[in-house]
Amino acid sequence: MRYIFIHILLSSFVFCSGFLKTQGRIIVDENDEKIIFKGFGLGGWVVLEGYMWNYPGFGSTTTMENAVEDLIGQDKKDEFFSLYRANYITEKDIKFLSQNGFNALRIPLHYKHFSPSFNEFIYDGFELLDPIINACRNNNMYVILDMHAAPGAQNTSDFSDSDGQTAKLFTEYSNQKWLTSVWRYIAEYYSNEPVVAAYDLLNEPVLPWGYGPQALRNIYEWVIDSIRTVDPNHVVIIEGNWYGNDHTGLLPPFDDEMVYSFHHYVGGSTDTATMYNQYRTGISLEYNVPLWVGEFGENSNYWGSNIKSFFER
């Protein structure tokens, strides 16, 4: 979905070399100092989003990549996207963000850059991420890895690279096994990397009609169990159903390093203060867990400024 800013509802930032962890309702560093993420989401870098390209119709990654290939051929398409991704975000940009008070990047991932087919694993995704992670290290910034496009797609929207018809992550068990294996692969690679602050396991899942919340919880449990076989260190972030905002069936926490996340945009159906005070802070207070605003913005600077101030209270 649309996003520019990320935020965590939890003090000044001092970059440390150890892993972050949860401590009650906050996230802390290796010195038990409270951390507040003030971050930027890299929409359109690895996972293409149609509205960011002003693409007419259903602008999924696959649709737009195919359109470019139809225009210039596969070899030129591959060359174009290689250059595009190499220049979309650079250390100069990260330094600029750091100098302007940001301390985190949320990076949307597409499973195909790690596993183009089930049980096939490649390094393409790591070759994209590693230079950015190193640049973040050099500029005192954290990275949150976000599975934006899961095998089969976790909703029917273009930004999950779905077919526009069915969220096949939920309807096909093979895709759930595939997602689990992809996250294990990523977690094993980054298990000793403290610049990676957390794994955001599924961006904005939407259960298909007829599927209850247990279907989403099962996937989260399988993924987390798989991650923990290779990586006991990193925080895991789970988003609720219906684009991240319905946590029915996902409480209480089922991992010691778990953070709950929601997304909020102008024009939502619920008043911000009511939503925040009655529901989302209720999760944090009742279950003593951190709460993270994974996306907010971006079509009103005035609204965005006000909501940022509200979340920082």
Segments and roles (model prediction):
Residues Y3-V14:
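Sec-dependent N-terminal signal peptides
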Residues C16-F102:
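N-terminal carbohydrate-binding accessory modules
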Residues D32, I107, Y199:
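Residue-level signature of catalytic and energy-coupling elements of molecular machines
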Residues F19, S174-A198, L202-R313:
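Extracellular glycoside hydrolase catalytic/binding regions
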Residues G44-V46, Y111-S115, P151, P205, ...:
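Feature marks short, surface-exposed loop/turn motifs that line or immediately flank catalytic pockets
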Residues L20, K76-L105, S115-A153, S157-A198, ...:
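An active-site-proximal structural segment forming one wall of the substrate-binding cleft
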Residues P108-H110, M147-N155, L202, G240-Y243:
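Short, solvent-exposed turn/loop segments enriched in Gly/Ser/Thr/Pro and often Arg
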